[in-house]
Curated annotation (Swiss-Prot):
This is DNA topoisomerase 3. Residues 686-713 have a biased composition (Basic and acidic residues). It comes from Bacillus cereus (strain ATCC 10987 / NRS 248). GO terms for biological process: DNA recombination; DNA repair; DNA topological change. Residues 686-718 are annotated as: Disordered. Residues 153-594 form the Topo IA-type catalytic domain. Residues 3-136 form the Toprim domain. SMART domains: TOP1Ac (SM00437), TOP1Bc (SM00436), TOPRIM (SM00493). Its cofactor is Mg(2+). Keywords: DNA-binding, Isomerase, Magnesium, Metal-binding, Topoisomerase. Mg(2+) binds at E9, D105. The active site is at Y310 (o-(5'-phospho-dna)-tyrosine intermediate). One of its GO terms (molecular function) is magnesium ion binding.
Length: 729
């Protein structure tokens, strides 16, 4: 009897599909049933081959060998996951298999994952496509009952290949050209470089900003009411001090007459469900977690604990087929402190409204929500518990009714001038009950602060005991932190110098710079290549980053290039543009970029040369600020030697409670704090032992130190193999 091979993107999804299809027999990298064989990728198993696979001369980076423009790009198996590729290959080549079902993520990249495997195996069997937005049993059953012909997604596949090949031609050539021309590792790309440019532009805005003093007026009444002056346009600030001085002087000995009391009943609805970017932003703001760290925590909650849904999503909505599962999800997450909240929601039928249920706004995956799986808090780390708390509270909040309140605005006249006061009375706590009414709102639009208003009637006269001038200064734009940088990457249109509204709209609709799955890696790569650095929570551009922007072609610095690409990739996906035409344009563009870099007369200057020499080649070492501390790296990119000088740890200073920096090597290592505190590593170990009641031993300390160096979870992507070979100067 003939069977169908189902290719899922990850083992966890494969297990869900196999369970529904009754594939119980376990094999080496697959699950088999009477009709189906379910196997899986691990992200990408196949990628574009390295330059040296076309010509051995490309093993060495030489400017004269550029541009590298192979007529046809080849595929290669990623070594890291070659075993699983062979497992998938063996199932595809089975004689009893007559059909392939692509069940990877429903989107451009998911299509590429499966099709590259099929192309590399060189198998020609009929293809069908499972296109679902969630992996519930019902969604899987419905999807298999409505499989689409594979050819319906040929254009989507062509679009995905076009994107990958364009990144190969431009990214690898531009990086090699910059690196060899200026003898410094200067990697660039259509996402990385505009991101660095946005950070540089923000720093320029801050540098060029000139603070202005503004003035206002506040009146205080004998019944402790504070009234704020407003002009005819509703502004409570003025840059004209003489005007404000004159008003204050003219109001002496005037009382306030209540002219109007405006009562409005208002509603505010819960913020939307989390997508990955929004979750990364909140985790950074509340806990200081990096985007990469939040993604890694989410992966564990998704794959290991199975309590949250797929993390790499760009949707803040769920699809209608998920609504029926909400009661079970509420029962699963409704434990501990969440029990009374979940119980309250379950008392009434759940209404699926457009604020969180919208099929049209779910593409590859729905928003991050709890699963129906059992929750065991004792198995969570502290960080996992915090991220889980964010997601569950947001999930509960959207299912609660609106926050309702009555806003009272008091309008008074003092002389001929208008003064107002504002207060709020809560009618129904609604979703804010989930946050114990401590949710931070961002809806403050003026300088009028809400206060408790006394009982007042229209026409009342209020005795004014004090009229005073207030003042403040305009503030420069804030530096980016990881939370705000993620927002800027998601919506870079306000940083674009373009009059092309359609281009800006396309960039916005296609998700901005990078994707939810890649932004954390991109930010991490910018730190690791020393183009940007952290000072506290703020992100600063380095001298190297500044020089990179000065050396790269102008077009690579703007998000516009990504917008133009996305327009054309969208046209390919719709069958309106041939992939070959786009790639031909990219090859010509690559020639222009390489030519511009070759003819540049600019110089790259290392302004961070230390007094240390490289132990391998003897050349000067450069001092750089890595993401987690200071490092020394060899100036010669061919050598690539690097060593840690110091790194920020999770150990806290016993005096000021800030994170300690670990400096030095071996037995001479010492913890240091900005407040001046110093402590040898050996003394630190003794203190830790005493604080833990003499229960700590060497293994505890080693485990602690190992945690500081723990590497992030590897993620297969099309350029993983190519990029890992890069040496950073």
């Amino acid at each position: 009897m003939s069977k169908s091979v189902v290719i899922a993107e990850k083992p966890s999804v494969a297990r869900d599909i196999a369970r529904v299809l009754k594939c119980d027999k376990k094999g080496n990298g697959y699950l088999e049933g009477s009709k189906y064989i379910v196997t899986w990728a691990l992200g990408h198993l196949v990628t574009l081959a390295d330059p040296e696979s076309y010509d051995v001369k490309y093993k060495k980076w030489n400017l004269e060998d550029l541009p590298m423009l192979p007529e046809r790009l080849k595929l290669t198996v990623i070594k890291q996951t070659g075993k699983q590729f062979n497992a998938v290959k063996s199932q595809l080549l089975r004689k009893d298999v007559n059909e392939i079902i692509v069940a990877t993520d429903a989107g451009r990249e998911g299509e590429l994952v499966a099709r590259w495997i099929i192309d590399k195996v060189r198998i020609n069997k009929p293809i069908k496509r499972l296109w679902i937005s969630s992996v519930t049993d019902k969604a899987i059953k419905d999807g298999f009952a409505n499989l689409k012909p594979g050819r319906a997604y040929d254009n989507l596949y062509a679009s995905a290949v076009a994107r990958s090949e364009a990144d190969w031609y431009i990214g690898l050539n531009a990086t090699r050209a910059l690196t060899t021309r200026f003898n410094a590792q200067l990697n660039c790309g259509r996402v990385q470089t505009p991101t660095v440019a946005m950070i540089a532009n923000r720093e320029d805005e801050i540098k060029n900003f000139k603070a202005q003093t503004y003035y206002g007026i506040e009146a205080q009444t004998t019944n402790q009411l504070k009234l704020t002056w407003q002009d005819a346009n509703g502004n409570s600030r003025s840059f004209n001090k003489e005007k404000i001085d004159g008003i204050v002087k003219g109001l002496d000995k005037h009382n306030a007459t209540v002219m109007e009391i405006d009562k409005k009943q208002k509603k505010s609805f819960s913020p939307g469900l989390y997508d990955l970017t929004e979750l990364q932003r909140d985790a950074n703001k509340k806990f200081g977690y990096s985007a990469k760290e939040t993604l890694n925590i989410m992966q564990k909650l998704y794959e290991q604990h199975k309590v949250l849904t797929y993390p790499r999503t760009d949707s803040r909505y769920i699809s209608s087929d998920i609504v029926g599962t909400l009661p079970e999800r509420l029962k699963a997450c409704g434990v501990g402190e969440y029990r009374p909240l979940a119980h309250k929601v379950l008392q009434k039928p759940i209404k699926a409204n457009k604020s969180f249920v919208d099929d049209s706004k779910v593409s590859d995956h729905h928003a991050i929500i709890p699963t129906e799986g059992y929750v065991n808090f004792s198995a969570f780390t502290d960080k996992e518990r915090k991220i889980y708390d964010l997601v569950v509270k947001r999930f509960l909040a959207v299912l609660f009714p609106a926050f309702e309140y009555e806003q009272l605005t008091l309008r008074t006249k003092v002389g001929n001038e208008t003064f107002i006061a504002r207060g709020k009375t809560i009618l129904h706590a609604g979703w804010k009950e989930v946050y114990e009414n401590r949710f931070e709102d961002d809806d403050v639009t003026d300088d009028v602060k809400e206060q408790l208003l006394p009982r007042i009637e229209k026409g009342d006269t209020l005795t004014v005991k004090l009229i005073m001038q207030t003042s403040g200064q305009t503030k420069a734009p804030a530096r980016f932190n990881e939370a705000t940088l993620l927002s800027a990457m998601e919506n870079p249109t306000k940083y674009m110098d373009t009059q092309n509204k359609q281009l800006a709209d396309t960039l916005k609709s296609t998700g901005g710079l990078g994707t939810v799955a890649t932004r954390a890696d991109i930010i991490d790569k910018l730190f690791n290549s020393f183009l940007i650095e952290k000072r506290g929570k703020d992100i600063h551009i380095t001298s190297k980053g500044r020089q990179l922007l000065d050396l790269v072609p102008e077009e690579l610095k703007s998000p516009t290039l990504t917008g133009e690409w996305e327009q054309k990739l969208e046209a390919i996906a719709k069958g309106k543009l041939k992939k070959e035409v786009f790639i031909s344009e990219m090859k010509n563009y690559t020639k222009e970029i390489v030519s511009e870099i070759k003819s540049s007369d600019k110089k790259y200057k290392h302004d961070n040369i230390s007094t240390k020499s490289c132990p391998d080649c003897g050349k000067p070492m450069l001092e750089v600020n890595g993401k987690k501390g200071k490092m020394l790296v060899c100036q010669d990119r061919e050598c690539g030697h690097r060593k840690n000088v110091s790194r920020t740890t999770n150990a806290r200073c016993p005096q000021c409670k800030k994170k300690l920096e670990l400096r030095g090597e071996g037995a001479g290592q010492i913890f240091a704090c900005k407040c001046g505190y110093r402590e040898k590593l050996s003394k630190f170990q003794e203190r830790r032992k005493k604080e833990s009641g003499n229960k700590a031993d060497k293994r505890d300390v080693q485990k602690y130190m190992k945690q500081q160096k723990k590497e992030e979870e590897p993620l297969n992507n099309p350029f993983a193999e190519a990029l890992k070979k890069l040496k950073f100067d």
